[in-house]
């Protein structure tokens, strides 16, 4: 898992550099190859994950395994004296860190590209394996609010496999 956390952190940093047109040694996120140790395939049960699917799964796991990586999203937009809308995210009742939304995933993977954004939206449809295999989903978007404003949440079953290396057994 640590290799994937490092990879996620690198891709997140590059995503921000590219979005804000900062100096960056990469011209696209896909140039950063994910680890090939098979860990993510094992815990998801999916053999051929795409780059974007790997990123979404790791984004959803970050609050549970390495929440400080997401602190970058607390940066303020000095033009409006508020956080960047495009980062999405929310703050929990007891967790002081950044909790990602679908908007966060869209920012990392699509930036301002509306066609890529459509691809991110497809990840959260009920026919995608994120949902059918009970890995993760978007929850809690308020009535009339944008679809991607929903909270990016991993299932208890998936968390059990990731954090405890065992199948979830409800009480």
List the predicted regions and their residue ranges:
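Intrinsically disordered, low-complexity N-terminal extensions of AAA+/P-loop NTPases
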Residues: 1-171
């Amino acid at each position: 898992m640590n290799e994937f956390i490092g990879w996620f952190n690198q891709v997140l940093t590059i995503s921000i550099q590219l979005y804000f047109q900062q100096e960056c040694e990469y011209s696209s996120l896909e140039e950063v190859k994910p680890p090939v140790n098979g860990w993510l395939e094992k815990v998801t049960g999916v053999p051929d994950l795409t780059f974007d699917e790997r990123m979404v799964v790791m984004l959803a796991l970050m609050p549970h395994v390495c929440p400080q990586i997401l602190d970058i999203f607390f940066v303020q937009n000095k033009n409006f004296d508020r956080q960047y809308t495009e980062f999405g995210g929310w703050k929990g009742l007891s967790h002081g860190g950044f909790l990602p939304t679908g908007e966060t995933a869209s920012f990392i993977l699509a930036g301002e590209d509306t066609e890529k954004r459509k691809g991110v939206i497809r990840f959260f449809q009920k026919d995608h394996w994120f949902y059918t295999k009970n890995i993760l989903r978007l929850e809690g978007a308020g009535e009339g609010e944008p679809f991607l404003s929903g909270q990016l949440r991993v299932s208890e079953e998936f968390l059990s496999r990731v954090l405890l290396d065992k199948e979830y057994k409800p009480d």
